[in-house]
Amino acid sequence: MAIVGSGNISTDLLYKLLRSDWLEPRWMVGIDPQSEGLARARKLGLETTHEGVDWLLAQPEKPDLVFEATSAYVHRDAAPKYEAAGIRAIDLTPAAVGPAVIPPANLRQHLDAPNVNMITCGGQATIPIVYAVSRVVEVPYAEIVASVASVSAGPGTRANIDEFTKTTSRGVETIGGAKRGKAIIILNPADPPMIMRDTIFCAIPEDADRDAIAQSIHDVVKEVQSYVPGYRLLNEPQFDDPSLNSGGQALVTTFVEVEGAGDYLPPYAGNLDIMTAAATKVGEEIAKETLSVAGGTR
């Protein structure tokens, strides 16, 4: 398989893929001949190029799977080329050419999709919790607040805050299962940098089974921890009775934090780590499914 993009996210992703029992990174594709990511990939034994996607597509042997961490406009241009070449794509950009995937919630539904999108870091961290609640009770409204270290937010994130909030809000509804969703991102300027912290508010019926909701949240947290070990609850889910402050709804509030594995990105950049870890998880499940359908074993 190939990694398209040679920046920080692609480099962190490379280290995760090299540990995988199911995925074998062979190529890294960039556009900057001086890229540190390409240099690292070469030292680790990958074939590299600074000539872009067209170079990859011109190779006599092509990858089965591409992970792309470039930009939305680059991926929108490349996606039809991948599909024409029979290459599956996992998209870590905001392009959203294919369906958005949150592993605990809807990965199984999209294992045969030619192109899947990893939505946003805030989505990967918070939508699993909304999903955990909505599979137990109806959630008329959910709101997530994602706080990330300012130094971990690159120019792309800063230029696309509105896109982040809209995309994540939509995912809270369509994947998380809330009737209505809202997302807020906070760039925390603290120094030393703070790890990613998220707050998830879900409106629930007054007579909801609180024990069942709490258990569902714990189950989903364990599922996320299977691929993001630094994902954890800060405390037990908090339940509040209906009040004027909550619009007359009962609430469950969940606090999580995400510490990165420190493969290449620093541990405080859990917002980026959860994207590369989730993408690796999706790639592994696609590989397992492909082998299963083909009748093979690994």
From Swiss-Prot:
Residues where NAD(+) binds: S6, G7, N8, I9, S152, A153, G154, P155, G156, T157, R158, A159, N160, N271
Domain of life: Bacteria
Catalytic activity: acetaldehyde + NAD(+) + CoA = acetyl-CoA + NADH + H(+)
Active site per UniProt: C121
Keywords: Aromatic hydrocarbons catabolism, NAD, Oxidoreductase
Class of enzymatic activity (EC top level): oxidoreductase
UniProt GO BP: catabolic process
Cystines in this chain: none
Keyword NAD listed: yes
Assigned EC number: 1.2.1.10
The keyword ATP-binding is assigned to this record: no
Pfam families in alphabetical order: AcetDehyd-dimer (PF09290)
Single GO term (MF): NAD binding
Family of the protein in this entry: Belongs to the acetaldehyde dehydrogenase family.
Annotated protein name in UniProt: Acetaldehyde dehydrogenase
